[in-house]
Amino acid sequence: MEEYQLYLELDRYRQQDFLYPLVFHEYIYGLAYSHDLNRSIFVENIGYDKKYSLLIVKRLITRMYRQNHLIISAKDSNKNRFLRYNKNFYSQIISEGFAIVVEILFSLQLSGSLEEAEIIKSYKNLRSIHSIFPFFEDKVTYLNYISDIRVPYPINLEILVQILRYWVKDAPLFHLLRLFLYDYCNWNSIIIPKKSIFLFSKNNPRFFFFLYNFYLCEFESIFFFLRTKSSHLRLKSFRVFFERIFFYAKKGHLVEVFLKDFFSTLTFFKDPFIHYVRYQGKSILASKNLPILMNKWKYFFIHLWQCYFDVWSQPRTIHINQLSEYSFHFLGYFLKVGLKHSVVRGQMLQNGFLIKILIKKLDIIVPIIPIIRLLAKSKFCNVLGNPLSKPSWADLSDFEIIARFLRICRNLSHYYNGSSKKKSLYRIKYILRLSCIKTLACKHKSSVRAFLKRLGSEELLEEFFTEEEEILSLIFPRTSSTLRRLHRNRIWYLDILFSNDNDIINHD
């Protein structure tokens, strides 16, 4: 990122609050399409001389502003295959370059804020999504109430553009942004159809994820700011803080804010035992205090979405549940708080007695049914969990077939080894093991029993169960009691950066 910043002379444009010229740099599109910085996507694909690449980008932007999006002239269309595509193709190309520009800008701002908050030193240790579960184990068992929140969408994109303008003072850049969004969405409607959002995210994945993450970041920045300053905001209207122009100016003078008659008012409160966790669009809010405080946070979220982002959200979509009676899904796991009975023997003088103790314990369980459905979708088994062969892999060598199945088992073990109960994980391994045997038998045109008999033993397939034990034995002492204890306990791997079920069972 520092190399790109130096190469694109980003500091000079940031000082002038003018990023629009960066869209005309051909190196931006080299980054967007994973090309080398010294080569141009336009030069490589079309055969243009290097000096014309800037002209092509300018032509594309000019054509986006015109009513006739198809062909500038017959002369141009005959010479340039590149100019015969439709307007969505032009928007897609330039939006990728636009996304690179804003990604670099906001990543630099994020790094600066982390350094100021002295978080940058521990940031690398918190990159793994599995670091959330040790946090749950330490905190959740002491809490009483939990709320499972879905961040509403789609957002009014015009509101999102207006919010972005308070971060970057560049009017031409946002005129271009509006033009991208206008190509995919009905700009005049308050609620953007989900079909348009799906089309936009499919054609412009980098740009879409930037806008979606910025929406979440803006929502959480207001939430965290008001959460930390809640003791100073008692009996104040929170509608006044939604005007972003005055929002940051009043951060140092919150006591001086006047009580005004706005559309909605919320009494702020102090809740030191509240915890908030989010991954993608799903959030978990947990608290130790009375449910009335959780109810206040619930209506705070609803008013925030409706008044600031113009996103409709109903109170019944957010449920407040008692943690001891509620279970929830998060990051592919099934979590619930259970009671563990423990008996302690005590003795006073000559009298002995037993003390029964109830201890809260967080159970993190592998959801066996969704994983079996995922395996059934990939044709490893049927919907009942009965293993099937993979005829499409029969043309591969035996070594490649076994390697693919082992890779899938390794991914599943790597991700779900933090489960409290390993029986479900072993069942999934068993399904994959039999699916591998059936695939090999199908390749050699024999039955499973005849194939195993001809093989003589199952040493070739023992890796399905011994590989994990060999890895653990390299880390911990080679004692049977230690390995048995490790198989019962949870093991979290802090090198998992994202969660995607399709990638877990992907053989590539």
UniProtKB/Swiss-Prot annotation:
Disulfide bonds: none annotated. Pfam families: Intron_maturas2, MatK_N. It is found in: Plastid, Chloroplast. GO terms for cellular component: chloroplast. InterPro entries: Domain_X, Maturase_MatK, Maturase_MatK_N. Keywords: Chloroplast, mRNA processing, Plastid, RNA-binding, tRNA processing. The keyword Plastid applies. Usually encoded in the trnK tRNA gene intron. Probably assists in splicing its own and other chloroplast group II introns. This is Maturase K. It comes from Acmispon americanus (American bird's-foot trefoil).
